[in-house]
């Protein structure tokens, strides 16, 4: 090897660890160093693992929010299109009367 520590495999967390991390994230999207140390000790994980879990979780949240926004915009476009069609329909009807 070239002296670099080999990259670790993917960390798998126990259900308990995940639940505790999610609970913490629910109250705080960012951790103080002090809190990170506390959680690391409580869950038998390293500070680095906690830090990276939170980074990944914030990214996941950002992606989810982006997806919701996209769905809402799509729905709005469809509503506007339907309103336009309805409007045209009514105008056509008015001409016939």
From Swiss-Prot:
CDD domains: homeodomain. It comes from the Eukaryota. It holds the Pfam family Abdominal-A. One of its GO terms (biological process) is anterior/posterior pattern specification. It is found in: Nucleus. Its main location: nucleus. Residues 6-65 bind DNA. The keyword rRNA-binding does not apply. Keywords: Developmental protein, DNA-binding, Homeobox, Nucleus. One of its GO terms (cellular component) is nucleus. Residues 73-86 have a biased composition (Basic and acidic residues). Residues 73-97 are annotated as: Disordered. One of its GO terms (molecular function) is DNA-binding transcription factor activity, RNA polymerase II-specific. Belongs to the Antp homeobox family. Sequence-specific transcription factor which is part of a developmental regulatory system that provides cells with specific positional identities on the anterior-posterior axis. Required for segmental identity of the first through tenth abdominal segments. This is Homeobox protein abdominal-A homolog.
């Amino acid at each position: 090897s070239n002296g670099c520590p080999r990259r670790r495999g993917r960390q798998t967390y126990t259900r308990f660890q995940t639940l505790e991390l999610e609970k913490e994230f629910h109250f705080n999207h960012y951790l103080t160093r002090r809190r990170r140390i506390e959680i690391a000790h409580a869950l038998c994980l390293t500070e680095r693992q906690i830090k990276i879990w939170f980074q990944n979780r914030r990214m996941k949240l950002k992606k989810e929010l982006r997806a919701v926004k996209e769905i809402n915009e799509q729905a709005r476009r469809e509503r506007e299109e339907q309103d336009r069609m309805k409007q045209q329909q009514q105008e056509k009807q008015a001409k016939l009367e």
